[in-house]
């Protein structure tokens, strides 16, 4: 009954207004209030500040500065080897596996469309049909920068306005098409395993999604899907390099072509992921 009420609340809640208001608060330089909120957040979610480059809550001028905090250089090691892909984030695997008949598994009784996830264009979705996916949830305590699993040249980006449902196991099990209806940014790279898509999915209280090449992404006045073509620009990011960040967090969906990679043997739904550790290996074709 409580779970049902929570889901009903998700539909009734003014999610975009709430996200805008909290986004403004998170961006405000509010002095002692900012420090107070950061300390409360650290205690509530058991955030490990020993890994942060700056561990003193008073160092951060805004809550966003704290939330997107940088790690110490030695805090994460990126797995070596050209054929090894690295975990792009700290988080936990929500679901992973094969893309079957153009659909990705969300939770028991729910799947969603690859085409819709990527903005509705067949040419964008086609390279990933019958491919593989991994959906990784970033909890409040996690490090909220997203890094490259493999060296890649940026080919295109798509920003898709949408809803801002909370993303967690409860909503995944009860909100149809959750990841294909929430606001999201899609970045597609050419890599040694073929095209790789990194989908950054927004959620309630996610004030913004940023990329290192375009900055903060926002919906235009008409709430239309926006496209950027980078094929003629040399924007190449090395494995382990930062590619984006959430100002307040959500989920990353990584997409790969058919027979391009094998996920790490110990990886499954529920697995904790740690930036830089083995995510997958390239399939060698004879």
UniProtKB/Swiss-Prot annotation:
One Pfam family in the UniProt entry: PS_Dcarbxylase
Any single Gene Ontology cellular-component annotation: plasma membrane
- Location of the protein in the cell: Cell membrane
InterPro entries per the UniProt record, alphabetical: PS_Dcarbxylase, PSD-B, PSD_type1_pro
On this chain, the residues bearing Pyruvic acid (Ser) are 250
Q: Which UniProt keywords apply?
A: Cell membrane, Decarboxylase, Lipid biosynthesis, Lipid metabolism, Lyase, Membrane, Phospholipid biosynthesis, Phospholipid metabolism, Pyruvate, Zymogen
Hey, which pathway is this one from?
Phospholipid metabolism; phosphatidylethanolamine biosynthesis; phosphatidylethanolamine from CDP-diacylglycerol: step 2/2
Q: Which reaction does it catalyse?
A: a 1,2-diacyl-sn-glycero-3-phospho-L-serine + H(+) = a 1,2-diacyl-sn-glycero-3-phosphoethanolamine + CO2
Cofactor details (free text): Binds 1 pyruvoyl group covalently per subunit.
The task this protein performs is described as: Catalyzes the formation of phosphatidylethanolamine (PtdEtn) from phosphatidylserine (PtdSer).
Q: What is this protein called?
A: Phosphatidylserine decarboxylase proenzyme
Q: What is the lineage of its organism?
A: Bacteria, Pseudomonadati, Pseudomonadota, Gammaproteobacteria, Alteromonadales
């Amino acid at each position: 009954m409580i779970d049902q009420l929570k889901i009903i609340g998700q539909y009734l809640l003014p999610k975009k207004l709430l996200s805008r208001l909290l986004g403004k608060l998170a961006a405000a330089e509010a002095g002692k209030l900012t420090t107070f909120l950061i300390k409360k957040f650290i205690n509530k979610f058991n955030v490990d500040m020993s890994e942060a480059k700056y561990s003193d809550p008073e160092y951060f001028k805004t809550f966003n500065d704290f939330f997107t905090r940088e790690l110490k250089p030695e805090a994460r090691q990126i797995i070596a080897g050209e054929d090894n892909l690295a975990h792009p984030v700290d988080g936990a695997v929500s679901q992973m596996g094969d893309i079957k008949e153009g659909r990705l598994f969300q939770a028991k009784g729910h799947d969603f469309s690859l085409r819709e996830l990527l903005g509705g264009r067949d040419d964008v979705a086609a390279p990933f049909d019958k491919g593989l996916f991994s959906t990784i949830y970033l909890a409040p305590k996690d490090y909220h920068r997203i890094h490259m699993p493999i060296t890649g040249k940026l080919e295109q980006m798509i920003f898709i306005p949408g809803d801002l449902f909370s993303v967690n196991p409860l909503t995944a099990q009860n909100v149809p098409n959750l990841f294909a209806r929430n606001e999201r940014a899609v970045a597609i790279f050419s890599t040694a395993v073929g095209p790789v898509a990194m989908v950054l999915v927004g959620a309630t209280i996610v004030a913004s999604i940023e990329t290192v090449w375009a900055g903060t992404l926002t919906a235009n006045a008409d709430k239309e899907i926006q496209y950027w073509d980078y094929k003629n620009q040399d924007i190449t990011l090395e494995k382990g390099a930062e590619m984006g960040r959430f100002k307040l967090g959500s989920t990353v969906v990584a997409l790969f072509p058919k027979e391009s990679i094998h996920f790490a043997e110990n990886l499954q739904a529920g697995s904790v992921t740690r930036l830089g550790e083995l995510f997958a290996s390239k399939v060698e074709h004879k």
